[in-house]
Amino acid sequence: MKYALILVLFFVVFIWQSSSSSANSETFTQCLTSNSDPKHPISPAIFFSGNGSYSSVLQANIRNLRFNTTSTPKPFLIIAATHESHVQAAITCGKRHNLQMKIRSGGHDYDGLSYVTYSGKPFFVLDMFNLRSVDVDVASKTAWVQTGAILGEVYYYIWEKSKTLAYPAGICPTVGVGGHISGGGYGNMMRKYGLTVDNTIDARMVDVNGKILDRKLMGEDLYWAINGGGGGSYGVVLAYKINLVEVPENVTVFRISRTLEQNATDIIHRWQQVAPKLPDELFIRTVIDVVNGTVSSQKTVRTTFIAMFLGDTTTLLSILNRRFPELGLVRSDCTETSWIQSVLFWTNIQVGSSETLLLQRNQPVNYLKRKSDYVREPISRTGLESIWKKMIELEIPTMAFNPYGGEMGRISSTVTPFPYRAGNLWKIQYGANWRDETLTDRYMELTRKLYQFMTPFVSKNPRQSFFNYRDVDLGINSHNGKISSYVEGKRYGKKYFAGNFERLVKIKTRVDSGNFFRNEQSIPVLP
Protein backbone atom coordinates (compact mmCIF):
# COMPACT_ATOMS: atom_id res chain seq x y z
CA MET A 1 0.00 0.00 0.00
CA LYS A 2 2.81 2.38 0.97
CA TYR A 3 4.67 1.78 -2.32
CA ALA A 4 1.44 2.20 -4.32
CA LEU A 5 0.87 5.57 -2.65
CA ILE A 6 4.44 6.64 -3.40
CA LEU A 7 3.97 5.62 -7.03
CA VAL A 8 0.73 7.62 -7.30
CA LEU A 9 2.38 10.65 -5.72
CA PHE A 10 5.33 10.32 -8.13
CA PHE A 11 3.04 10.43 -11.17
CA VAL A 12 1.03 13.34 -9.73
CA VAL A 13 4.25 15.30 -9.20
CA PHE A 14 5.55 14.27 -12.63
CA ILE A 15 2.33 15.39 -14.38
CA TRP A 16 2.34 18.68 -12.43
CA GLN A 17 6.00 19.30 -13.28
CA SER A 18 5.42 18.46 -16.94
CA SER A 19 2.45 20.81 -17.29
CA SER A 20 4.25 23.50 -15.30
CA SER A 21 7.35 23.06 -17.46
CA SER A 22 5.25 23.33 -20.62
CA ALA A 23 3.66 26.57 -19.43
CA ASN A 24 7.01 27.96 -18.35
CA SER A 25 8.55 27.03 -21.71
CA GLU A 26 5.83 28.92 -23.54
CA THR A 27 6.32 32.00 -21.36
CA PHE A 28 10.09 31.73 -21.73
CA THR A 29 9.77 31.52 -25.51
CA GLN A 30 7.58 34.61 -25.56
CA CYS A 31 10.25 36.40 -23.54
CA LEU A 32 12.96 35.34 -25.99
CA THR A 33 10.95 36.54 -28.97
CA SER A 34 10.15 39.93 -27.46
CA ASN A 35 13.76 40.52 -26.36
CA SER A 36 15.56 39.65 -29.60
CA ASP A 37 16.09 41.66 -32.77
CA PRO A 38 13.03 41.24 -35.07
CA LYS A 39 15.36 41.54 -38.07
CA HIS A 40 17.00 38.32 -36.87
CA PRO A 41 14.11 36.13 -35.63
CA ILE A 42 15.06 33.84 -32.77
CA SER A 43 12.25 31.30 -33.29
CA PRO A 44 14.17 29.14 -35.83
CA ALA A 45 17.04 28.92 -33.31
CA ILE A 46 14.86 27.48 -30.52
CA PHE A 47 14.63 23.70 -30.09
CA PHE A 48 12.29 22.22 -27.49
CA SER A 49 12.69 18.83 -25.88
CA GLY A 50 10.53 16.54 -27.99
CA ASN A 51 10.94 18.68 -31.11
CA GLY A 52 12.04 16.69 -34.17
CA SER A 53 15.44 18.38 -34.43
CA TYR A 54 16.09 18.70 -30.70
CA SER A 55 17.99 15.43 -30.28
CA SER A 56 20.23 15.95 -33.29
CA VAL A 57 21.14 19.49 -32.14
CA LEU A 58 21.82 18.31 -28.58
CA GLN A 59 23.88 15.29 -29.63
CA ALA A 60 25.85 17.05 -32.38
CA ASN A 61 28.34 18.46 -29.87
CA ILE A 62 28.32 15.81 -27.16
CA ARG A 63 31.93 14.58 -27.16
CA ASN A 64 31.66 12.15 -24.24
CA LEU A 65 29.19 9.26 -24.44
CA ARG A 66 28.94 9.22 -20.64
CA PHE A 67 26.62 12.19 -21.09
CA ASN A 68 24.56 10.82 -23.95
CA THR A 69 22.57 8.16 -22.12
CA THR A 70 18.86 7.85 -21.38
CA SER A 71 19.50 8.83 -17.75
CA THR A 72 21.53 11.96 -18.58
CA PRO A 73 19.67 15.16 -17.53
CA LYS A 74 18.56 17.01 -20.66
CA PRO A 75 17.90 20.72 -21.21
CA PHE A 76 14.23 21.57 -21.69
CA LEU A 77 15.27 23.90 -24.50
CA ILE A 78 18.29 24.71 -26.69
CA ILE A 79 18.96 28.12 -28.19
CA ALA A 80 21.29 27.59 -31.16
CA ALA A 81 22.05 31.30 -31.52
CA THR A 82 22.56 32.62 -35.03
CA HIS A 83 22.84 36.29 -34.07
CA GLU A 84 24.31 38.20 -31.14
CA SER A 85 20.84 39.42 -30.14
CA HIS A 86 19.89 35.80 -29.45
CA VAL A 87 22.62 35.64 -26.82
CA GLN A 88 21.37 38.86 -25.26
CA ALA A 89 17.80 37.52 -25.17
CA ALA A 90 18.92 34.23 -23.62
CA ILE A 91 20.62 36.07 -20.75
CA THR A 92 17.76 38.53 -20.21
CA CYS A 93 15.08 35.84 -20.16
CA GLY A 94 17.15 33.31 -18.25
CA LYS A 95 17.54 35.84 -15.45
CA ARG A 96 13.90 36.91 -15.57
CA HIS A 97 12.65 33.34 -15.28
CA ASN A 98 15.34 32.24 -12.81
CA LEU A 99 16.56 29.46 -15.08
CA GLN A 100 20.06 28.05 -15.23
CA MET A 101 21.78 28.58 -18.57
CA LYS A 102 24.57 26.31 -19.79
CA ILE A 103 26.88 27.70 -22.49
CA ARG A 104 28.30 25.31 -25.09
CA SER A 105 30.96 26.11 -27.67
CA GLY A 106 32.41 22.85 -29.02
CA GLY A 107 31.17 20.41 -26.39
CA HIS A 108 34.62 19.17 -25.34
CA ASP A 109 34.07 19.80 -21.64
CA TYR A 110 35.34 16.43 -20.38
CA ASP A 111 32.71 16.20 -17.64
CA GLY A 112 29.89 17.66 -19.69
CA LEU A 113 29.29 20.81 -17.66
CA SER A 114 28.52 22.87 -20.76
CA TYR A 115 25.37 20.87 -21.49
CA VAL A 116 24.52 18.75 -18.40
CA THR A 117 23.44 19.71 -14.89
CA TYR A 118 24.12 17.81 -11.68
CA SER A 119 21.44 19.73 -9.73
CA GLY A 120 18.32 18.09 -11.13
CA LYS A 121 16.78 21.53 -11.77
CA PRO A 122 15.43 22.69 -15.16
CA PHE A 123 18.03 24.29 -17.40
CA PHE A 124 18.54 25.36 -20.98
CA VAL A 125 21.59 25.39 -23.26
CA LEU A 126 22.86 28.39 -25.18
CA ASP A 127 24.66 26.68 -28.07
CA MET A 128 27.19 28.85 -29.89
CA PHE A 129 28.07 26.58 -32.83
CA ASN A 130 26.36 28.79 -35.43
CA LEU A 131 28.44 31.82 -34.40
CA ARG A 132 31.71 30.67 -35.93
CA SER A 133 33.12 33.28 -38.30
CA VAL A 134 36.92 33.58 -38.63
CA ASP A 135 38.07 36.95 -40.01
CA VAL A 136 41.82 36.89 -40.74
CA ASP A 137 43.82 40.09 -41.35
CA VAL A 138 47.23 39.10 -42.70
CA ALA A 139 48.56 42.67 -42.71
CA SER A 140 48.13 43.08 -38.95
CA LYS A 141 48.73 39.38 -38.22
CA THR A 142 45.48 39.19 -36.27
CA ALA A 143 42.08 37.52 -36.54
CA TRP A 144 38.65 37.95 -34.99
CA VAL A 145 37.29 34.51 -34.16
CA GLN A 146 33.77 33.83 -32.93
CA THR A 147 33.58 31.41 -30.03
CA GLY A 148 31.43 28.85 -31.85
CA ALA A 149 34.25 28.14 -34.30
CA ILE A 150 36.32 25.00 -33.88
CA LEU A 151 40.12 25.04 -33.96
CA GLY A 152 40.18 23.24 -37.29
CA GLU A 153 38.21 26.09 -38.85
CA VAL A 154 40.56 28.66 -37.33
CA TYR A 155 43.63 26.85 -38.67
CA TYR A 156 42.10 26.33 -42.11
CA TYR A 157 41.07 29.96 -42.63
CA ILE A 158 44.45 31.23 -41.43
CA TRP A 159 46.15 28.84 -43.88
CA GLU A 160 43.88 30.05 -46.71
CA LYS A 161 45.26 33.57 -46.24
CA SER A 162 48.89 32.80 -45.32
CA LYS A 163 51.22 29.81 -45.41
CA THR A 164 53.55 31.30 -42.76
CA LEU A 165 51.08 32.42 -40.08
CA ALA A 166 49.49 30.19 -37.45
CA TYR A 167 47.82 30.22 -34.03
CA PRO A 168 49.37 28.40 -31.03
CA ALA A 169 46.34 26.43 -29.88
CA GLY A 170 45.36 22.80 -29.36
CA ILE A 171 45.94 19.71 -31.48
CA CYS A 172 42.31 18.54 -31.61
CA PRO A 173 40.57 20.33 -34.52
CA THR A 174 37.01 19.85 -33.20
CA VAL A 175 37.63 21.70 -29.92
CA GLY A 176 35.53 24.87 -29.65
CA VAL A 177 37.29 28.23 -29.49
CA GLY A 178 35.16 29.56 -26.62
CA GLY A 179 36.03 26.94 -24.05
CA HIS A 180 39.58 26.47 -25.29
CA ILE A 181 40.69 30.08 -24.96
CA SER A 182 38.68 30.89 -21.83
CA GLY A 183 40.36 28.01 -19.98
CA GLY A 184 43.93 28.70 -21.10
CA GLY A 185 44.24 26.30 -24.03
CA TYR A 186 47.65 25.05 -25.13
CA GLY A 187 49.19 23.31 -28.10
CA ASN A 188 52.47 22.08 -29.54
CA MET A 189 53.85 25.60 -30.03
CA MET A 190 53.44 26.68 -26.40
CA ARG A 191 57.18 26.45 -25.67
CA LYS A 192 57.75 29.00 -28.45
CA TYR A 193 54.69 31.23 -28.17
CA GLY A 194 52.92 30.40 -24.91
CA LEU A 195 49.23 29.64 -24.53
CA THR A 196 46.16 30.82 -26.43
CA VAL A 197 45.58 33.40 -23.69
CA ASP A 198 49.07 34.79 -24.23
CA ASN A 199 48.05 35.57 -27.80
CA THR A 200 44.68 37.31 -27.42
CA ILE A 201 44.38 41.08 -27.60
CA ASP A 202 40.65 41.84 -27.45
CA ALA A 203 37.25 40.25 -26.95
CA ARG A 204 33.55 40.93 -27.36
CA MET A 205 31.16 39.59 -24.74
CA VAL A 206 27.62 39.93 -23.43
CA ASP A 207 27.47 40.73 -19.72
CA VAL A 208 24.82 39.83 -17.16
CA ASN A 209 22.79 42.91 -18.13
CA GLY A 210 22.71 41.93 -21.79
CA LYS A 211 25.17 44.59 -22.88
CA ILE A 212 27.84 43.92 -25.51
CA LEU A 213 31.29 44.94 -24.30
CA ASP A 214 34.73 45.01 -25.88
CA ARG A 215 38.01 45.11 -23.97
CA LYS A 216 37.86 48.88 -23.49
CA LEU A 217 34.27 48.87 -22.24
CA MET A 218 34.63 45.86 -19.94
CA GLY A 219 37.88 47.06 -18.37
CA GLU A 220 41.13 45.23 -17.78
CA ASP A 221 39.95 43.22 -14.75
CA LEU A 222 37.07 41.54 -16.55
CA TYR A 223 39.15 41.08 -19.69
CA TRP A 224 41.81 39.38 -17.56
CA ALA A 225 39.19 37.02 -16.09
CA ILE A 226 37.70 35.88 -19.40
CA ASN A 227 41.18 35.32 -20.82
CA GLY A 228 42.00 32.11 -18.97
CA GLY A 229 39.75 32.23 -15.89
CA GLY A 230 37.34 29.61 -17.18
CA GLY A 231 34.21 29.95 -19.31
CA GLY A 232 30.68 30.23 -18.01
CA SER A 233 31.38 32.44 -14.98
CA TYR A 234 31.43 36.09 -16.07
CA GLY A 235 29.35 36.42 -19.24
CA VAL A 236 29.10 35.00 -22.74
CA VAL A 237 32.15 35.70 -24.88
CA LEU A 238 31.09 36.25 -28.48
CA ALA A 239 34.53 36.50 -30.08
CA TYR A 240 38.23 36.86 -29.35
CA LYS A 241 40.75 38.89 -31.29
CA ILE A 242 43.91 36.82 -31.54
CA ASN A 243 47.50 37.47 -32.52
CA LEU A 244 48.81 35.19 -35.24
CA VAL A 245 52.36 33.87 -34.97
CA GLU A 246 55.01 33.21 -37.58
CA VAL A 247 55.91 29.69 -38.67
CA PRO A 248 58.37 28.54 -41.35
CA GLU A 249 57.09 27.30 -44.70
CA ASN A 250 58.06 23.80 -43.60
CA VAL A 251 58.15 22.23 -40.15
CA THR A 252 59.31 18.78 -39.04
CA VAL A 253 57.24 16.19 -37.18
CA PHE A 254 57.86 12.66 -35.98
CA ARG A 255 56.15 9.88 -34.05
CA ILE A 256 58.21 6.98 -32.71
CA SER A 257 57.54 4.37 -30.03
CA ARG A 258 59.73 2.50 -27.57
CA THR A 259 58.78 -0.26 -25.13
CA LEU A 260 60.41 -1.27 -21.86
CA GLU A 261 62.36 -3.87 -23.82
CA GLN A 262 63.67 -1.03 -26.01
CA ASN A 263 64.99 1.01 -23.07
CA ALA A 264 61.87 3.13 -22.58
CA THR A 265 62.77 3.73 -18.94
CA ASP A 266 66.18 5.22 -19.79
CA ILE A 267 64.65 7.30 -22.58
CA ILE A 268 61.88 8.73 -20.37
CA HIS A 269 64.35 9.36 -17.57
CA ARG A 270 66.42 11.41 -19.99
CA TRP A 271 63.36 13.03 -21.63
CA GLN A 272 62.29 14.61 -18.37
CA GLN A 273 65.76 16.16 -18.02
CA VAL A 274 65.97 17.61 -21.54
CA ALA A 275 62.45 18.15 -22.94
CA PRO A 276 61.78 21.32 -20.90
CA LYS A 277 65.23 22.71 -21.81
CA LEU A 278 65.36 22.04 -25.55
CA PRO A 279 65.14 24.97 -27.99
CA ASP A 280 61.79 26.75 -27.79
CA GLU A 281 60.97 25.66 -31.34
CA LEU A 282 60.88 21.98 -30.31
CA PHE A 283 58.00 20.30 -28.47
CA ILE A 284 58.16 16.55 -27.72
CA ARG A 285 55.11 15.01 -26.08
CA THR A 286 55.20 11.43 -24.86
CA VAL A 287 52.13 9.22 -24.52
CA ILE A 288 52.47 6.20 -22.25
CA ASP A 289 50.20 3.17 -22.46
CA VAL A 290 50.14 -0.59 -21.83
CA VAL A 291 50.38 -2.98 -24.78
CA ASN A 292 51.11 -6.64 -25.45
CA GLY A 293 54.75 -7.59 -24.99
CA THR A 294 56.90 -9.82 -27.15
CA VAL A 295 55.16 -12.73 -25.44
CA SER A 296 51.43 -12.27 -26.03
CA SER A 297 50.51 -13.27 -22.48
CA GLN A 298 52.73 -10.55 -21.03
CA LYS A 299 52.09 -6.83 -20.94
CA THR A 300 54.63 -4.06 -21.35
CA VAL A 301 54.69 -0.29 -21.28
CA ARG A 302 54.99 1.63 -24.54
CA THR A 303 56.14 5.24 -24.77
CA THR A 304 55.26 7.12 -27.94
CA PHE A 305 57.11 10.37 -28.66
CA ILE A 306 55.29 12.87 -30.87
CA ALA A 307 57.13 16.03 -31.87
CA MET A 308 56.73 19.36 -33.60
CA PHE A 309 59.81 21.32 -34.64
CA LEU A 310 59.60 24.75 -36.22
CA GLY A 311 62.50 24.03 -38.55
CA ASP A 312 64.02 21.50 -40.95
CA THR A 313 64.94 17.86 -40.39
CA THR A 314 68.70 18.39 -40.55
CA THR A 315 68.61 20.96 -37.77
CA LEU A 316 66.32 18.78 -35.66
CA LEU A 317 68.61 15.76 -35.98
CA SER A 318 71.59 17.88 -35.04
CA ILE A 319 69.84 19.05 -31.87
CA LEU A 320 68.59 15.65 -30.76
CA ASN A 321 71.76 13.72 -31.61
CA ARG A 322 73.60 16.12 -29.35
CA ARG A 323 71.05 16.71 -26.58
CA PHE A 324 68.91 13.55 -26.59
CA PRO A 325 70.80 10.69 -28.30
CA GLU A 326 68.96 8.14 -26.13
CA LEU A 327 65.89 8.64 -28.32
CA GLY A 328 67.72 7.22 -31.34
CA LEU A 329 65.96 9.44 -33.87
CA VAL A 330 66.96 8.94 -37.52
CA ARG A 331 66.08 10.87 -40.66
CA SER A 332 63.56 8.28 -41.85
CA ASP A 333 61.52 8.87 -38.67
CA CYS A 334 60.98 12.51 -39.64
CA THR A 335 58.51 14.19 -41.97
CA GLU A 336 59.04 17.69 -43.32
CA THR A 337 55.77 19.33 -44.24
CA SER A 338 53.77 22.55 -44.05
CA TRP A 339 52.40 23.75 -40.73
CA ILE A 340 48.81 23.05 -41.80
CA GLN A 341 49.73 19.47 -42.74
CA SER A 342 51.44 19.06 -39.36
CA VAL A 343 48.05 19.77 -37.78
CA LEU A 344 46.67 16.77 -39.67
CA PHE A 345 49.67 14.67 -38.60
CA TRP A 346 49.02 15.45 -34.93
CA THR A 347 45.41 14.39 -35.44
CA ASN A 348 46.56 11.00 -36.77
CA ILE A 349 45.57 11.91 -40.33
CA GLN A 350 48.04 11.01 -43.07
CA VAL A 351 50.22 13.86 -44.30
CA GLY A 352 49.09 14.81 -47.80
CA SER A 353 45.39 14.53 -46.99
CA SER A 354 43.08 17.40 -47.88
CA GLU A 355 43.20 20.37 -45.52
CA THR A 356 39.40 20.58 -45.77
CA LEU A 357 39.27 17.68 -43.29
CA LEU A 358 39.91 20.33 -40.64
CA LEU A 359 36.47 21.78 -41.34
CA GLN A 360 34.68 18.59 -40.31
CA ARG A 361 32.98 19.10 -36.96
CA ASN A 362 31.95 15.49 -36.40
CA GLN A 363 34.33 12.83 -35.12
CA PRO A 364 33.94 9.37 -33.55
CA VAL A 365 33.14 9.67 -29.85
CA ASN A 366 33.80 7.41 -26.88
CA TYR A 367 33.00 7.13 -23.23
CA LEU A 368 35.93 8.81 -21.54
CA LYS A 369 37.47 10.15 -18.35
CA ARG A 370 40.33 12.64 -18.01
CA LYS A 371 42.37 13.97 -15.09
CA SER A 372 45.48 16.14 -14.84
CA ASP A 373 48.62 16.84 -12.81
CA TYR A 374 51.79 18.92 -12.93
CA VAL A 375 55.30 17.62 -12.27
CA ARG A 376 57.84 19.96 -10.69
CA GLU A 377 60.71 17.55 -9.95
CA PRO A 378 62.21 14.79 -12.12
CA ILE A 379 61.09 11.26 -11.25
CA SER A 380 63.83 8.78 -10.36
CA ARG A 381 64.36 5.55 -12.29
CA THR A 382 63.00 3.66 -9.29
CA GLY A 383 59.94 5.89 -9.34
CA LEU A 384 59.42 5.35 -13.06
CA GLU A 385 59.72 1.60 -12.66
CA SER A 386 57.08 1.64 -9.92
CA ILE A 387 54.79 3.65 -12.21
CA TRP A 388 55.24 1.14 -15.04
CA LYS A 389 54.40 -1.69 -12.66
CA LYS A 390 51.23 0.07 -11.55
CA MET A 391 50.19 0.84 -15.13
CA ILE A 392 50.62 -2.79 -16.14
CA GLU A 393 48.53 -3.80 -13.14
CA LEU A 394 45.73 -1.36 -14.08
CA GLU A 395 46.27 -1.89 -17.84
CA ILE A 396 43.67 0.62 -19.08
CA PRO A 397 44.62 4.23 -18.15
CA THR A 398 47.15 6.15 -20.25
CA MET A 399 49.28 9.18 -19.49
CA ALA A 400 50.41 12.00 -21.78
CA PHE A 401 53.42 14.10 -20.67
CA ASN A 402 53.50 17.62 -22.15
CA PRO A 403 56.79 19.47 -21.56
CA TYR A 404 56.98 23.05 -20.34
CA GLY A 405 59.96 25.41 -20.38
CA GLY A 406 60.68 27.95 -23.08
CA GLU A 407 58.18 30.81 -23.21
CA MET A 408 56.07 29.11 -20.53
CA GLY A 409 58.82 29.77 -18.01
CA ARG A 410 59.20 33.44 -18.95
CA ILE A 411 55.62 34.60 -18.45
CA SER A 412 54.52 35.61 -14.95
CA SER A 413 51.90 33.44 -13.23
CA THR A 414 49.65 36.49 -12.76
CA VAL A 415 49.65 37.94 -16.29
CA THR A 416 46.60 35.76 -17.02
CA PRO A 417 44.48 33.63 -14.66
CA PHE A 418 46.38 30.54 -15.86
CA PRO A 419 48.97 30.24 -13.06
CA TYR A 420 51.17 27.24 -13.87
CA ARG A 421 54.24 28.59 -15.61
CA ALA A 422 57.86 28.62 -14.34
CA GLY A 423 58.83 25.75 -12.07
CA ASN A 424 56.68 23.16 -13.82
CA LEU A 425 58.56 20.57 -15.87
CA TRP A 426 55.56 19.01 -17.55
CA LYS A 427 51.83 18.48 -17.37
CA ILE A 428 50.20 15.05 -17.19
CA GLN A 429 46.91 14.12 -18.77
CA TYR A 430 45.44 10.84 -17.51
CA GLY A 431 42.94 9.21 -19.82
CA ALA A 432 40.74 6.22 -20.44
CA ASN A 433 38.42 5.60 -23.40
CA TRP A 434 35.86 2.82 -23.78
CA ARG A 435 32.94 1.87 -26.02
CA ASP A 436 30.72 -0.18 -23.70
CA GLU A 437 28.58 1.71 -21.16
CA THR A 438 28.77 -1.19 -18.72
CA LEU A 439 32.52 -0.57 -18.34
CA THR A 440 32.06 3.02 -17.13
CA ASP A 441 32.42 2.52 -13.38
CA ARG A 442 35.40 0.19 -13.76
CA TYR A 443 37.35 2.35 -16.19
CA MET A 444 36.75 5.51 -14.20
CA GLU A 445 37.93 3.80 -11.04
CA LEU A 446 41.07 2.53 -12.78
CA THR A 447 41.87 6.08 -13.91
CA ARG A 448 41.39 7.38 -10.38
CA LYS A 449 43.68 4.67 -9.02
CA LEU A 450 46.50 5.70 -11.34
CA TYR A 451 45.96 9.35 -10.38
CA GLN A 452 46.11 8.40 -6.70
CA PHE A 453 49.27 6.34 -7.22
CA MET A 454 50.99 9.34 -8.80
CA THR A 455 50.52 11.50 -5.67
CA PRO A 456 54.18 11.33 -4.50
CA PHE A 457 55.49 12.42 -7.91
CA VAL A 458 53.39 15.52 -8.61
CA SER A 459 52.75 19.03 -7.28
CA LYS A 460 51.46 19.55 -3.75
CA ASN A 461 49.66 22.18 -1.66
CA PRO A 462 47.67 22.49 -3.79
CA ARG A 463 47.85 19.55 -6.12
CA GLN A 464 47.61 21.50 -9.36
CA SER A 465 45.08 20.75 -12.09
CA PHE A 466 44.40 22.13 -15.57
CA PHE A 467 40.98 23.78 -15.91
CA ASN A 468 40.50 22.66 -19.50
CA TYR A 469 40.91 19.04 -18.40
CA ARG A 470 37.67 19.37 -16.45
CA ASP A 471 37.49 16.97 -13.52
CA VAL A 472 34.49 16.93 -11.18
CA ASP A 473 36.39 14.60 -8.84
CA LEU A 474 38.02 17.81 -7.56
CA GLY A 475 34.68 19.02 -6.25
CA ILE A 476 31.39 20.44 -7.46
CA ASN A 477 29.42 23.50 -6.46
CA SER A 478 25.76 23.16 -5.51
CA HIS A 479 25.34 26.98 -5.27
CA ASN A 480 23.15 26.66 -2.19
CA GLY A 481 23.95 29.94 -0.49
CA LYS A 482 26.92 32.25 -0.90
CA ILE A 483 28.95 30.89 2.03
CA SER A 484 28.71 27.22 1.06
CA SER A 485 29.15 28.12 -2.61
CA TYR A 486 32.39 29.96 -1.87
CA VAL A 487 33.72 27.09 0.27
CA GLU A 488 32.85 24.53 -2.40
CA GLY A 489 34.26 26.73 -5.15
CA LYS A 490 37.53 27.22 -3.32
CA ARG A 491 38.04 23.45 -3.19
CA TYR A 492 38.42 23.11 -6.97
CA GLY A 493 39.22 26.75 -7.72
CA LYS A 494 42.54 26.74 -5.86
CA LYS A 495 43.62 23.63 -7.76
CA TYR A 496 42.80 25.18 -11.12
CA PHE A 497 43.91 28.77 -10.48
CA ALA A 498 46.16 28.72 -7.38
CA GLY A 499 46.86 32.28 -6.19
CA ASN A 500 44.72 33.79 -8.95
CA PHE A 501 41.51 32.26 -7.57
CA GLU A 502 40.74 35.05 -5.09
CA ARG A 503 41.13 37.76 -7.73
CA LEU A 504 38.74 35.85 -9.98
CA VAL A 505 36.21 35.65 -7.12
CA LYS A 506 36.38 39.42 -6.59
CA ILE A 507 35.86 40.09 -10.29
CA LYS A 508 32.99 37.59 -10.44
CA THR A 509 31.32 39.24 -7.43
CA ARG A 510 31.58 42.67 -9.03
CA VAL A 511 30.27 41.74 -12.49
CA ASP A 512 27.71 39.02 -11.58
CA SER A 513 26.79 39.38 -7.91
CA GLY A 514 23.59 37.38 -8.46
CA ASN A 515 25.61 34.42 -9.78
CA PHE A 516 23.53 33.98 -12.93
CA PHE A 517 26.50 32.60 -14.87
CA ARG A 518 27.19 29.40 -13.01
CA ASN A 519 27.89 25.72 -13.38
CA GLU A 520 29.17 22.98 -11.12
CA GLN A 521 32.74 24.31 -11.31
CA SER A 522 32.24 28.01 -11.97
CA ILE A 523 33.88 30.81 -10.00
CA PRO A 524 31.74 31.61 -6.91
CA VAL A 525 30.85 35.03 -5.51
CA LEU A 526 32.13 36.33 -2.19
CA PRO A 527 29.98 35.36 0.82
Swiss-Prot record:
Main localisation: secreted
Keywords of this entry: Cell wall, Disulfide bond, FAD, Flavoprotein, Glycoprotein, Nucleotide-binding, Oxidoreductase, Secreted, Signal
Cofactor: how bound: Binds 1 FAD per subunit in a bicovalent manner.
Cofactor: FAD
Signal peptide as annotated in the record: 1-20
Domain FAD-binding PCMH-type: 71-247
Top EC class of this enzyme: oxidoreductase
Flavoprotein keyword on record: yes
Sites where a glycan is attached: N51, N68, N250, N263, N292
UniProt-listed PROSITE patterns: FAD_PCMH
GO cellular component: extracellular region; plant-type cell wall
Disulfide bond annotation, renumbered to this chain: C31-C93
PTM comment text: The FAD cofactor is bound via a bicovalent 6-S-cysteinyl, 8alpha-N1-histidyl FAD linkage.
Cellular location(s): Secreted, Cell wall
InterPro entries per UniProt: BBE, FAD-bd_PCMH, FAD-bd_PCMH-like_sf, FAD-bd_PCMH_sub1, FAD-bd_PCMH_sub2, Oxid_FAD_bind_N
GO molecular function, one term: oxidoreductase activity
This enzyme's EC code(s): 1.1.1.-
Cross-link for 6-(S-cysteinyl)-8alpha-(pros-histidyl)-FAD (His-Cys), residue positions: H108-C172
Protein family membership: Belongs to the oxygen-dependent FAD-linked oxidoreductase family.
The protein's name: Berberine bridge enzyme-like 8
Species this protein is from: Arabidopsis thaliana (Mouse-ear cress)
